[in-house]
Swiss-Prot record:
SUPFAM superfamilies: ApaG-like
One Pfam family recorded for the sequence: DUF525
Signal peptide region: none
Lineage summary: Bacteria, Pseudomonadati, Pseudomonadota, Gammaproteobacteria, Enterobacterales
Name the record gives this protein: Protein ApaG
InterPro entries: ApaG_domain, ApaG_sf, Uncharacterised_ApaG
PANTHER family noted in UniProt: F-BOX ONLY PROTEIN 3 (PTHR14289), POLYMERASE DELTA-INTERACTING PROTEIN 2 (PTHR14289:SF16)
Single Gene Ontology BP annotation: error-free translesion synthesis
Start and end residues of each ApaG domain: 1-125
């Protein structure tokens, strides 16, 4: 039996007020992703897919190779962390998606990126 790779994804987001211009409907957010390899063999991140939704329901899809110009190899028990950003036209939105990955045998699999919120702090009580 082939063991399914065990990968955990966690995301933290923040509002970047210094780069935002609310009067021009420009709300900038940074998010930090931590990808942990909980399995017993290497995994490599090959690509990404994001679905970004603003509070008006407008959706944008983003996909491409790797993340921040890398296709990291993550060893068992290790993690890879990176920070990136998103610009919305509204002060509230969500992101979700998946990573395209390969295991140590070259078998492709997807790791889900759970939905997370992008919001200016004054909107969340």
């Amino acid at each position: 039996m082939i063991e399914q790779p065990r990968v955990c994804v966690q995301v933290q987001s923040i509002y970047v007020e210094t780069q935002s211009i609310p009067d021009e409907e420009r709300f900038v957010f940074a998010y930090t992703v931590t990808i942990r390899n909980l399995g017993r063999s290497n995994v490599q991140l090959m690509g990404r897919y994001w679905l970004i939704t603003n509070s008006n329901g407008r959706q944008t899809e983003v996909q491409g190779e790797g993340v921040i110009g890398e296709q990291p190899l993550i060893l068992p028990g290790n993690e890879f962390q990176y920070t990136s950003g998103a610009v919305l036209e509204t002060p509230l939105g969500t992101m979700e998606g998946h990573y395209e990955m390969v295991d140590h045998l070259g078998q492709a699999f997807r790791t889900v990126i759970p939905v997370f919120r992008l919001a200016i702090p004054t909107l969340i009580h």
